């Protein structure tokens, strides 16, 4: 066991859930944040050690500050932040996305990462160490109509935000990495305008695959910073759609 503390947002499902479980198995004390207590409590039963549940809407800066303050009061430090909270909206393209939905996606997917990162960053500067992992997306690197302008814009910004941490705080011993997964079989797929088949989901990257990538980052020597990681399914639907008539049977 170690005495390290990891705070995971979006811990109630998907990548956040599996990251919390795997970090706890590595000996971390995990703090699980998300909007739904029932989901977080369920995840906590799968974690090793003594996980702490903190209800949080990352789009509310005052709520983020409150939870951060409570974590520091309890543990005095945060060694790893995994910012995994994210959403998209079913009506997501230019012809049908509302102002309200656009703002909601930006507030959670971008502002929420900024709020958590900024607070944790200042504490990590005091500690002279720390790892920040922001769960971005394939859409943070490649513009796609599949994800729409709000999500794509937010994730591109997350990548830039993450690298700016390395530029400004690397000399404090702080490392930041944006993980950019392609299609991952998480609940966010259920928000797609066109449903994803179970057969296709099985071929996608799984949440536990992304979690293993986070574990890899935590195991690197502190002198090593992986700025960005792009992950995609071997059977990549984006590639397949372009090669439909050329793929050998």
Predicted regions and their residues:
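Conserved glycine-rich cofactor-binding loop
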Residues: 12-14
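Substrate-binding pocket helix/loop in short-chain dehydrogenase/reductase
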Residues: 92-94, 98-104
């Amino acid at each position: 066991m170690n005495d390290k503390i990891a705070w995971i947002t979006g811990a109630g499902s998907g990548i956040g859930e599996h990251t919390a479980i795997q970090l706890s198995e590595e000996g971390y004390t995990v703090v699980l944040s998300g909007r739904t207590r029932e989901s977080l409590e369920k995840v906590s039963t799968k974690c090793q050690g003594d996980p702490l549940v903190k209800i949080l809407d990352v789009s509310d800066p005052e709520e983020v500050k409150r939870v951060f303050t409570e974590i520091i009061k309890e543990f005095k430090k945060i060694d790893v932040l995994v910012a995994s909270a994210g959403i998209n909206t079913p009506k997501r393209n230019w012809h049908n996305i509302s102002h309200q939905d656009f703002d909601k996606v930006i507030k959670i997917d971008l502002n929420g990462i900024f709020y958590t990162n900024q607070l944790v960053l200042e504490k990590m500067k005091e500690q002279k160490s720390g790892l920040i992992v922001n769960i971005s997306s394939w859409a943070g690197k490649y513009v796609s109509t599949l994800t729409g302008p709000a999500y794509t814009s937010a994730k591109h910004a997350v990548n830039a935000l993450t690298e700016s941490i390395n530029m400004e705080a690397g000399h404090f011993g702080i490392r930041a990495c944006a993980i950019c997964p392609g299609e991952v079989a998480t609940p966010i797929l259920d928000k797609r305008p066109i449903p994803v088949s179970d057969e296709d989901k099985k071929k996608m990257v799984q949440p536990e695959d992304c979690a293993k990538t986070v574990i890899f980052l935590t195991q690197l020597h502190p002198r090593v910073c992986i700025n960005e990681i792009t992950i995609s399914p071997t059977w990549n639907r984006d590639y397949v759609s372009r090669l439909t008539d050329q793929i050998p049977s």
